[in-house]
């Protein structure tokens, strides 16, 4: 069956439908990872977005459910050059096509993803419409496509109830803004007791749990939407509790301390982004998934200073807070998918809680 992707600039891509037979309007973004498509599909940070995989062959190692980064996939759609009909992997439990259909996710294959990615790079991230209905009239659906925006996705992806992951070491409260599983896994691996709480948990309730440290997780959407959450984070900043923040959490902490954020032209999504540690001069290859960044020109240097920078485009990738046990990074040290070069940051957080 034919499937179509119509972008808000009026361009149309034709391919084959290999997923669920439904329409979807979404923000179209691209990911440059060669592997890790299941982790991408189940990363809550992609809520409200359809993902173009730039690597030309997807699905060749199937689906292993243990690799999921959430209890369900969050993408609105998947766009690939070629979907493998054969999965060769001793861990394989399902085909990617079955996974997409079971989870009602549309997928287009057979389109020129190089051309599509080039268009998104040149013109910036765009909204798009995925459909199997060939009777569409571009002029009639453009307004609907342009009006779409990613809204209210943090509450949708966050846990609704607090829960505890046992450990005998330090107690860490993980505020779930759409947290990937591997964040908690990395903390448990280091012996921590992890208490995962909903995104809208009040600071006073978090303090009642007597945490040794607090983690602000990754998550989807525009950080500025989360006005009430930002107010609670400011209250946590005013304590002496060690705080480690990742991705959206990094942006929220920056906003809570008076800085600004802005939308990137086409974002950073993939497992091959170089970031430079400004203190040591060392460069790490990182896993990234964000469409917004902290504006360094708005930082109060009496509060925080840049700690990491993106080697490719010079955007901020981390902050160090003055006279506070707080550090934040824009990228994903927990990886999954991607390199584990920066997993040492979890060790740094543990040491910070012990000091």
Task: Kindly give the residue locations of the regions a language model identified.
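RNA-binding accessory domains that recognize and position tRNA/RNA substrates
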Residues: 1-204, 208-209, 223, 336, ...
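Short clusters of small/polar residues that mark proteolytic maturation junctions
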Residues: 17-18, 55, 288, 311, ...
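Proline-centered loop/turn at the N-terminus of a beta-strand
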Residues: 106, 171, 242-244, 260, ...
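Active-site glycine-centered loops adjacent to acidic/histidine catalytic or metal-binding residues
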Residues: 112, 247, 290, 332
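Active-site-proximal beta-strand elements of phosphoester/diester hydrolases
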Residues: 171-176, 286-287, 327-331
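Cysteine-nucleophile active-site neighborhood
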Residues: 213, 217-285, 293, 338-353
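Catalytic beta-strand/loop cores that center a nucleophilic Ser/Cys/Thr
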Residues: 282-324
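A glycine-centered loop/beta-turn motif at secondary-structure junctions
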Residues: 318-355
């Amino acid at each position: 069956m034919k499937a179509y992707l119509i972008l808000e600039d009026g361009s149309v891509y034709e391919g084959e439908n290999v997923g669920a037979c439904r329409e979807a309007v979404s923000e179209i973004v691209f990911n440059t990872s060669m592997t890790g498509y299941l982790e991408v599909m189940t990363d809550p940070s992609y809520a409200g977005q359809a993902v173009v995989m730039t690597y030309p062959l997807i699905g060749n190692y199937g689906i292993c459910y243990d690799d999921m980064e959430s209890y369900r996939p969050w993408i609105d759609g998947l766009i690939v050059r070629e979907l493998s009909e054969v999965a060769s992997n001793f861990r394989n439990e399902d085909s990617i096509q079955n996974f997409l259909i079971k989870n009602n996710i549309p997928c287009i294959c057979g389109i020129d993803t190089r051309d599509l990615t080039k268009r998104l790079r040149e013109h910036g991230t765009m909204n798009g419409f995925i459909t199997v209905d060939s009777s569409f009239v571009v002029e009639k659906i453009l307004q609907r496509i342009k009006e779409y925006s990613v809204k209210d996705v943090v509450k949708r992806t966050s846990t609704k109830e607090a829960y505890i992951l046992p450990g005998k070491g330090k107690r860490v409260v993980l505020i779930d803004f759409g947290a990937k599983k591997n964040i908690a896994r990395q903390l448990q691996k280091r012996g921590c007791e992890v208490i995962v709480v909903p995104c809208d948990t009040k600071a006073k309730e978090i303090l009642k749990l007597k945490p040794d440290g607090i983690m602000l997780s990754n998550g989807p959407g525009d950080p500025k939407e989360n006005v009430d959450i930002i107010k609670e984070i400011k209250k946590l900043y005013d304590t002496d509790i060690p705080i480690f923040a990742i991705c959206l959490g990094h942006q929220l902490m920056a906003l809570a301390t008076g800085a600004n954020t802005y939308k990137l032209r086409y974002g950073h999504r993939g497992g091959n982004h170089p970031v430079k540690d400004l203190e040591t001069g060392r460069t790490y290859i990182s896993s990234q998934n964000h469409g917004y960044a902290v504006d360094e020109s708005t930082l109060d240097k009496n509060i925080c200073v840049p700690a990491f920078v993106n080697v490719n485009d010079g955007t901020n990738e981390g902050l160090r807070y003055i006279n506070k046990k707080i550090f934040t990074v824009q990228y994903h040290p927990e990886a999954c998918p991607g390199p584990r070069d920066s997993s040492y940051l979890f060790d740094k957080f543990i040491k910070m809680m012990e000091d």
